[in-house]
Design a protein with these regions (language model features):
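Short, charged low-complexity linear segments at domain edges
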Residues: 1-15, 46-67
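Short, flexible, mixed-charge glycine/proline-rich loop motifs
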Residues: 16-28, 72-78
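Short cysteine-rich clusters marking metal-coordination/redox-active sites
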Residues: 29-34, 84-87
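Structured alpha/beta or helical-core interaction and ligand-binding surfaces enriched in interleaved
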Residues: 30, 39-45, 56
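Short, non-ligating residues that shape and space the ligands of small metal-coordination modules
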Residues: 38-41, 90-94
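Short cysteine/histidine-rich zinc-coordinating motifs and their immediately flanking basic loops
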Residues: 42-50, 95-102
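Short microdomains enriched in Cys/His and/or Lys/Arg
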Residues: 51-75, 104-118
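Cysteine-rich micro-motifs
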Residues: 53-58, 79-89
Length: 118
């Protein structure tokens, strides 16, 4: 299990609604295990805004929770769970959604937890 800062695996970590479009620009994520690249955009993060439902089995969720406790990191308000399509590594992207008044909102990618034991 690894906790990785988002800026080391994503090409873009900040999205703002009044500047970025829903599907462009994209942020490219590179899996640290197999180097597979996936693209994410603001719409992906809006879809999972304030998400607290995991698609991982309970055991996987518990391991991630323990990793956060061990790292002493505060849990951001949103996450996306998925399995790398190439190497099948369990991956959770943690991000913070924010509102900036009446006209804008956005997302800041914080860190990624991968289970390289799967």
């Amino acid at each position: 299990m690894q906790l990785i800062e988002a800026n080391t695996v994503f090409s873009k970590i900040d999205f703002q609604e009044d500047i970025d479009y829903n599907i462009y620009p994209k942020s490219i994520y590179e899996c640290p295990i197999c180097k597979n690249k996936l693209s994410f955009n603001m719409q992906d993060f809006k879809k999972y805004s304030l998400n607290k439902n995991s698609s991982f089995p309970i055991e996987e969720q518990e391991r991630i929770k323990k990793m956060l406790e061990f790292s002493k990191r505060e849990e951001p308000n949103s996450f996306i769970d998925y399995y790398c399509p190439k190497c099948n590594t369990s991956t959770r992207i943690y991000f913070t959604v924010w509102a900036g008044g009446r006209y804008t909102s956005g997302s800041h990618l914080e860190f990624v937890v991968i289970d390289d034991d799967t």
